[in-house]
């Protein structure tokens, strides 16, 4: 069976600061994403914390390949009821803010953030934005692995 794996990129407030987030999955309509925040079901969430330069787009191909492998494995073993979501959260100010967001939120596009600020930002993302799931896997690349361990 063929699955269409899509990627959606949004700007969301995390700890009052605008953050670019991408989510990859097979069903990314607004209604579905709102529904899945409240209903755990057979959801598996994979959170990717990037290394530098901290851009979510760098992991788009990686996330799609992971989901494709998981879906093919589920099909092979006869388990087609899991709903996988692959989230990647950018680091603060590592992605250019859109013009319409530059003067809103708690930070400005020229603010600098220390490593501890970035770690707190990822914790805030998990608490505020990441949907609940049966299983959550956290992956980190380079400095993202360090943040994950903190």
Task: Give short role names for the model-derived ranges.
Residues 1-13, 22:
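An N-terminal hydrophobic leader/cap segment in hydrolases
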Residues 15-103:
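Short, surface-exposed "cap/lid" segments of acyl-processing enzymes
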Residues 44-45, 135-137:
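Structural motif
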Residues 55-62, 115-118, 122, 144:
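Alpha-helical interaction elements in eukaryotic regulators
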Residues 103-116:
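Catalytic nucleophile-loop/oxyanion-hole region of alpha/beta-hydrolase
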Residues 117-136:
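Conserved acidic catalytic loop of the alpha/beta-hydrolase fold
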Residues 139-144, 148:
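Gly/Ala-rich beta-loop-alpha elbow adjacent to hydrolase catalytic centers
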């Amino acid at each position: 069976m063929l699955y269409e794996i899509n990627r959606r990129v949004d700007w969301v407030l995390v700890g009052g600061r605008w953050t670019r987030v991408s989510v990859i999955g097979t069903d990314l309509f607004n209604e579905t994403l709102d529904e899945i925040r409240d209903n755990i079901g057979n959801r598996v969430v994979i959170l990717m914390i990037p290394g530098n330069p901290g851009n979510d787009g760098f992991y788009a191909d990686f996330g799609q390949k992971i989901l494709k492998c998981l879906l093919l494995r589920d099909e092979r073993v006869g388990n087609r009821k899991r709903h996988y979501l692959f989230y990647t959260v950018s680091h603060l100010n590592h992605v250019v803010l859109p013009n319409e967001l530059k003067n809103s939120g708690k930070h400005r596009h020229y603010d600098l953030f220390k490593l501890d600020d970035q770690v707190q930002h990822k914790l805030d993302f998990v608490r505020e934005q990441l949907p609940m799931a049966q299983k959550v896997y956290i992956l980190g690349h380079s400095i993202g692995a360090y943040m994950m361990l903190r």
